Amino acid sequence: VDPEVYLYQVENAMLNAGETWADSYACRLRWMQYCTGIWGYGTVNFTECAGWGGTVYSNYNTAGKYATHIPYYIQANLPEQEAAYSNLIEVARVLLITKGIQTSDVYGSLAYTDAWGTRNGRPEILEPAFQTQEELYPIWNQELKEAANKLATATSQISFKNYDLAYGGDMSKWVKATNAVRLRLALRLLNRKPEEAKAIAREVLSSGNIFDNIDDSFVLYFDNHWTTLGDWHSVIDMDRASVCFMNYLKKYNDPRKRLFFQINNLTPENVAAFNALETTTPKQIIPTDLSRWEGGHVSYDLQAEDVCRTSRYLDDIDMRPMNRPQPRLWKGAQDEGTAGGWVPLVTYADFCFMAAEFTLEGVASGKTAQEWYEEGVKASLKFWSKIADYCKINNYEAITDAEIEEYMAQEGIAWNPSMAKEQIYCQTWIEHFKNNNESWAMYKRVGYPSTTSTLVTWEPIHVYGELQQVPRRKKFTMPADGSPNYANQVKRLEDMQKESNFGRLDSEHGRVWWEN
């Protein structure tokens, strides 16, 4: 077996349909108020999302067993070529750490240094110790720093471009991506260890190897067949646009609106025809002031009377006012589509917004915070236009330069030093419509969006009058006596409980270390 074959297994574990269904469609699209659910969970969407986090943990372990198997396999079978496979080893490591950051957001402490022993030549380590985030982050930062250096300097390397789903073998872009992941790590550290975070950011932003256009974005591109594996289509079975997100998109005439969602069928002719049907009840009557772009309430207590939520059909025409997400953004094969799939890890716009925030924190970066912000907004508009074309979404219409200029000139979008951070956070939230682990992480770090934020204003979520909160981590229970790796599992939980804001083991509202 060529060792690069294992790289595909790592890439495939970065996201799959199961993780997307459980974590995004059923949870974070709703928690972050991009969408409202029309199927699944209902009253317990903010408390008992039982499947949430299970697949991301499984995918982390899959990525780990293959990423750490690569160097062992080479040492055991191709020792004379070990140096020539340095790039392959480091690329797999970068992917694993990226997945580790995501997984640790949900679970806190993870097995890493001692993990996957049976796959990497250490079969004696059957019960690995767990490491806290405070221990993991310096390890990951150092490994990323070393990986960037090796990727920049390695020579006489064996090509794996046919298995490189991000950059097709372009190692200069992998160096930039590695530094981008370091900046992501630094942002996680900003609350707990601000000086260390800023030192990492300073090092990255002065390195000369950072993203400078949308084509540098750290994105995995899969083929059409990959999008047929699992329930990628479920986004349109489960979710519709939220009133919060649609209000924002309409208020600022954001051209990404037509890329994120499909226009509804509420033409004047269709509305008149539906309202005239003998079978249309008074409750089903469609108000004539509804537009082609509408969102629905996320709050359970408001859904029963939400006219935008009611399911209606005119023959086979879907007349529900709430807009459907563009399904091919998730499943290129939807409706006989021919496009592939994509997994955003760190986009150029994402990088710009992180750099803008660190610049506001006093980190010299070669640009002002305003320049980073404006570059990020433009990059987001251009990237989403490009990716929507790649996905062959329904009724695709590219975003024009004129639309970008008009959007950027609006009050609330044009740079305003008095609300600079909120502007950065708002645009970060929009950018992460698909990569919503990151908008969730931002919410956990800075509390944005919220019911009091101005550019994007969440609605308060109530279930039978009780105010709901966004979950912040996985619920835990102590392992049963005699269960695998019992002592280390117990120590893991006891160590996390030492943090004052960790909360009860079984509370999804407790905090992981970096949030505090």
Where are these regions (language model features)?
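Extended ligand-binding clefts on enzyme/binding-domain cores
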Residues: 201-352, 359-457
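Conserved, well-structured interaction surfaces
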Residues: 34-113, 117-159, 338-343
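Internal, well-ordered domain-core segments that constitute the primary functional module
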Residues: 138-222
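Membrane-proximal, proline-rich intrinsically disordered regions
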Residues: 1-33, 37-40, 75-79, 449, ...
